[in-house]
């Protein structure tokens, strides 16, 4: 027991590692219900003294398992509009590579300066998420009465649904998905909310289909970013300068996977307001810590 209490990993004691695991489980559940689980785990890591870039990289890599679990849960909806994936996944892929490369190659001081702004942007999106989701739902309902032949209708067969979705994928949608990929590869948090807003406006699909595509795109951005992190960390950086904390990655992966499985059960019993309040509180904590580090050094 004493040996367990004295155990350390990356300079973090057993108690702090257990806290990371709990935060990762909570993040997995949050992602299942309202998204933005990164704003749970990232502040916890930063508050423990983990450098911001290492916290972002390790967190993003650890959450990948939960991302693909969420996408698998929407596999039926994704298959219905699979015709859009051939153009949207490459856009997310390229954006994720660029965002991840910027994160891991620019001086850490740049991220330390930019991250507080991105946290504020993420918190604004989290706060606005209910109104955005309600607007997207209203738009989906209005589309059912829309005479525009490109709009999905309840009576459409599978081939028609796929064709209408594919026809709606123009350069504006591809460009915005690409930019969302850069944001996701660089900071991770709230990219799902951003994608839902984009696709709610431009993609001819139901709300559930758009949510399925969103889950898959987020998973690909995070996977692409993770591969980029590893390549840059091991091919460019010196061993003493590497930022990936593999122990933290493993703990978050286990926790977020467990959280993803229990999220649906817990999420139906907890108010989204409560979950969102926790995200905002932890996001403000991270903002305070980073501003203090920025001002004090």
Placement of each model-derived feature along the sequence:
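Hydrophobic alpha-helical transmembrane segments in multi-pass integral membrane proteins
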Residues: 98-104, 177-187, 225-234, 286-297
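Selected transmembrane alpha-helices and immediately adjacent juxtamembrane segments
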Residues: 2-51, 140-211, 218, 250
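Transmembrane helix exit motif
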Residues: 68-79, 117-163, 285-297
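Residues within membrane-spanning alpha-helices of integral membrane proteins
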Residues: 17, 60, 115-119, 123, ...
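Selective hydrophobic functional segments
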Residues: 61-117, 121-122, 223-273
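Transmembrane helix-loop junction
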Residues: 47-48, 100, 104, 113, ...
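Cytoplasmic-side transmembrane-helix entry/capping segments in multi-pass membrane proteins
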Residues: 81-91, 115, 139-141, 212-219, ...
